[in-house]
């Protein structure tokens, strides 16, 4: 390059670049930029814990202060990844402790985190401040107690939808009396009761506490006491609202909420009785986020609540809201940017539909800033998809989950091909897309042609043949993660577009028609890919033509992993070796 920046000037310039992707691009400019970038990067994101070794990360980024780490594939959220598959945090924690003692923040998602990991964190990082565990497992409240007792500058402790061995609520007592630094505390996934007196003392001596998310065991009386201690909260996850309504309790609850002048986000509300909802009305005008995904409240009561939420930007709710409830959202919540509607029952059927596609049509017409949708329903139509695409071209995330597999447009009995063509063609900024319902290969031809910015794509029960995969891998230029289940494609498209897989983060396939022989050929052809065959009930022998139950393919610079359980077969690069599986000891 003709222009060279002095190192200090370049360091100063890089200090304004926060995006991981932008910093990655900077590091590719030249050797000196690579060196400056790696020595100054404070925040590191690893999207797949097996894509790179912990040692390589610590070696490259010696000044790392924050690590974000992801483990199991996304389909683990739907119980499609067997227990014991992997995603172990210990090698990473051990490597960080040995080389990065100045680490201050760890965020992990879908990882196996043991108490030993948490104890190592507490003992190794003298100025540790942030621990966020999302959908993690393997640890108990003893591990959390170690973090609470030792990390004297802890600002954030969040356990989000984790599976935790709950050994009792006394872990809160391990926070030292000198602990005053907490900004966010989330223990909503725990089961046991906590000592409200311990929690009150902790909250009272934490003047900067802004976010508090409680578990269902916290009663209304406990909630009232805590709100009195922390009226400065901006984010609150309540405990259970199942207690019988008493006038005195209602009055205290209303008063406590009315004093929370800065509250912007509200969640929890487990088993809330409709009679208690008016106690929340005082905070509704200031809410920007409302999560009612655990609140079994019916449509009329929801409407009374939502009509007061004029600033709402994010709404999570169950399908009990019905079409009329979403029509109210469209009328009253003009700032809405994100909508998620979850099923209230796992086995919905078309004979008792609490909401239809019309609810989402209402919102797409009335909420002009809407850019993210997750919508579970029993049936859908092409006409609804046309309207959504026309009214909301600014959508960045569209995840439609039609619960009944292979469900066509229920009014015309046609595939939903043209509707998803409209979404792909009309929503040019789409980054994430989930499709379902009856779809032919044509739908994926349209998606491949128009969805040029889609980075994550999820598909279930769709397509006719290999052409589906061909259209996606040849057309979706920005695709990084592809998840497919129960679709009728096989080897041809997978092998034909093997080079595309090296530009992606991962490909997950389950219950498709991919053969064992194709997996071996792919691994031999693409040495930088790990090809894992996952089968909990493997046959006694595997002929080349035998289909595999699940495969997980991902790009890596670390080589085959060494912690595979017996039901995971790693395809080696040496065709004579074929496959191997190593049991975890």
From Swiss-Prot:
Pathway: Protein modification; protein ubiquitination. It is found in: Nucleus. Induction: Partially repressed by miR393a (microRNA) in response to flg-22 (flagellin-derived peptide 22). Signal peptide: none annotated. GO terms for biological process: auxin-activated signaling pathway; carbon catabolite repression of transcription by glucose; defense response; pollen maturation; protein ubiquitination; response to auxin. Ubiquitous. Keywords: Auxin signaling pathway, Developmental protein, Nucleus, Plant defense, Ubl conjugation pathway. Residues 77-78, 343-348, 401-405, 460-461 are annotated as: Interaction with auxin-responsive proteins. Its main location: nucleus. Gene3D superfamilies: 1.20.1280.50, Ribonuclease Inhibitor. Residues 1-48 form the F-box domain. One of its GO terms (molecular function) is auxin binding. InterPro entries: COI1_F-box, F-box_dom, Leu-rich_rpt_Cys-con_subtyp, LRR_dom_sf, Transp_inhibit. The keyword tRNA processing does not apply. Pfam families: F-box_5, Transp_inhibit. Part of a SCF (SKP1-cullin-F-box) protein ligase complex. Interacts with CUL1, SKP1A/ASK1 and SKP1B/ASK2. Interacts with Aux/IAA proteins (IAA7 and IAA12) in an auxin-dependent manner. Component of SCF(ASK-cullin-F-box) E3 ubiquitin ligase complexes, which may mediate the ubiquitination and subsequent proteasomal degradation of target proteins. Auxin receptor that mediates Aux/IAA proteins proteasomal degradation and auxin-regulated transcription. Involved in embryogenesis regulation by auxin. Confers sensitivity to the virulent bacterial pathogen P.syringae. Mediates glucose repression in yeast. PANTHER family: F-BOX/TPR REPEAT PROTEIN POF3, GRR1-LIKE PROTEIN 1. This is GRR1-like protein 1. The lineage of its organism: Eukaryota, Viridiplantae, Streptophyta, Embryophyta, Tracheophyta.
């Amino acid at each position: 390059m003709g222009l060279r920046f002095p190192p200090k000037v370049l360091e100063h310039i890089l200090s304004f670049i926060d995006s991981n992707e932008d910093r990655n691009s900077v590091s590719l400019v030249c050797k000196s930029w690579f060196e400056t970038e790696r020595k100054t990067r404070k925040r590191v994101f690893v999207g797949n814990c097996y894509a790179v070794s912990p040692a390589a990360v610590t070696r490259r980024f010696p000044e790392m202060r924050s690590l974000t780490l992801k483990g199991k594939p996304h389909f683990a959220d739907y119980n499609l990844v067997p227990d014991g598959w992997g995603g172990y945090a210990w090698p990473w924690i051990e490597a960080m402790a040995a080389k990065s003692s100045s680490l201050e923040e760890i965020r992990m998602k879908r990882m196996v985190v043991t108490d030993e990991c948490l104890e190592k964190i507490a003992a190794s990082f003298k100025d540790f401040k942030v621990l966020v565990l999302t959908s993690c497992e393997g640890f108990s409240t003893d591990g959390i107690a170690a973090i609470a007792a030792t990390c004297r500058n802890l600002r954030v402790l969040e356990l989000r939808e984790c599976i935790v061995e709950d050994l009792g609520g006394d872990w809160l007592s391990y926070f030292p009396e000198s602990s005053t630094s907490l900004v966010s505390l989330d223990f909503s996934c725990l089961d046991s009761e906590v000592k409200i007196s311990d929690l009150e003392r902790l909250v009272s001596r934490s003047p900067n506490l802004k976010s508090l998310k409680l578990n269902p065991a916290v009663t209304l009386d406990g909630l009232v006491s805590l709100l009195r201690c922390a009226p400065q909260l901006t984010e609150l996850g309540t405990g259970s609202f199942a207690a019988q309504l008493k006038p005195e309790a209602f009055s205290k609850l209303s008063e406590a909420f009315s004093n929370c002048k800065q509250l912007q986000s509200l969640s929890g509300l487990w088993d809330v009785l409709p009679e208690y909802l008016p106690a929340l009305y005082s905070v509704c005008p200031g809410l920007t986020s409302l999560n009612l995904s655990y609140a079994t409240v019916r449509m009329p009561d929801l409407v009374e609540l939502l009509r007061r939420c004029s600033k709402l930007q994010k709404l999570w709710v169950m399908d009990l809201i019905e079409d009329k409830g979403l029509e109210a959202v469209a009328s009253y919540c003009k700032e809405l940017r994100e909508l998620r509607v979850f099923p209230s029952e796992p086995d919905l059927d078309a004979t008792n539909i609490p909401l239809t596609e019309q609810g989402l049509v209402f919102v797409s017409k009335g909420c002009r800033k809407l850019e993210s949708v997750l919508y579970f329903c029993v049936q859908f139509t092409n006409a609804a998809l046309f309207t959504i695409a026309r009214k909301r071209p600014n959508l960045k995330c569209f995840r439609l989950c039609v619960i009944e597999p292979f469900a066509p447009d229920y009014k015309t009995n046609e595939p939903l091909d043209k509707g998803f063509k409209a979404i792909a063609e009309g929503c040019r900024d789409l980054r994430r897309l989930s499709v379902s319902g009856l779809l032919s290969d044509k739908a994926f031809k349209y998606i491949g042609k128009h969805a040029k910015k889609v980075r994550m794509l999820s598909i279930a029960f769709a397509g006719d043949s290999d052409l589906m995969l061909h259209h996606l891998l040849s057309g979706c230029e920005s695709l990084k993660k592809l998840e497919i289940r129960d679709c009728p494609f096989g080897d041809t498209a997978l092998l034909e577009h093997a080079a595309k897989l090296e530009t992606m983060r991962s490909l997950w396939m389950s219950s498709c028609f991919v053969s064992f022989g194709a997996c071996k050929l792919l691994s031999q052809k693409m040495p930088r890919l790990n090809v894992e065959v996952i089968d909990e009930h493997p046959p006694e022998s595997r002929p080349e033509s035998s289909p595999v139950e699940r495969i997980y393919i991902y790009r890596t610079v670390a080589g085959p992993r060494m912690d595979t359980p017996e039901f995971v077969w790693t395809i080696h690069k040496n065709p004579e070796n074929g496959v191997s599986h190593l049991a975890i000891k």
